[in-house]
């Protein structure tokens, strides 16, 4: 906690007066055993990133009014037996590969949508997937997706408040195209 406060304090001069901070904390496992003889500090490394929240939020605000283009990429979501999707980690090269693929598509506001290894909708590279149709929110089964605060808020709070049903199921790309 002290390190976060120290980082924010050192970065204050780079922020505008009313900026909110987006803090990302990455912790590595430390050196692999093959490097045990290297003469450096052993143990985990902590990286604290601090940047203005407006860099992401401000650039996305128009999407709430105009929507975005979902692009199904050739990059698949990593199945749960290889990496537990309940672990929110920052080491997701497959997300980067999907985003690079989408960045090559003509147009703007293109966002990657990944399929699971069976060809069903899994998730975006930084988002859960929800589709509203006939008073029902459809979302992928939780097998290969990050289950977190956003998903729980939509399912447990937002859907009931709006009188919407929620169905967790395998969603085919065809279902999204309709």
PLM regions with names:
Residues 1-20, 26:
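Glycine-rich, N-terminal phosphate-binding loop and its surrounding beta-alpha-beta segment
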Residues 1-10, 33-178:
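Helix-start/capping segments and mature chain N-termini
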């Amino acid at each position: 906690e002290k390190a976060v406060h120290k980082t924010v304090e050192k970065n204050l001069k780079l922020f505008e007066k009313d900026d909110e901070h987006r803090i990302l904390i990455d912790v590595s496992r430390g050196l692999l055993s093959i490097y045990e003889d290297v003469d450096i500090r052993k143990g985990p490394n902590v990286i604290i990133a601090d940047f203005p929240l407006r860099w992401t939020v401000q650039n996305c605000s128009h999407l709430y009014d105009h929507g975005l283009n979902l692009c199904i990429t050739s990059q698949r979501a990593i199945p749960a037996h290889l990496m537990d999707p309940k672990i929110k980690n920052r080491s997701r090269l497959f997300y980067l590969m999907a985003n690079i693929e989408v960045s090559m598509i003509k147009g703007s506001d293109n966002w990657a949508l990944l399929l699971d290894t069976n060809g069903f909708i899994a998730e975006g590279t930084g988002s859960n997937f929800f589709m509203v149709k006939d008073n029902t929110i459809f979302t992928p089964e939780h097998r290969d997706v990050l289950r977190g605060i956003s998903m729980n808020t939509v399912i447990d709070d937002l859907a009931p408040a709006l009188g919407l049903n929620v169905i967790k199921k395998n969603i085919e790309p065809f279902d999204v195209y309709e």
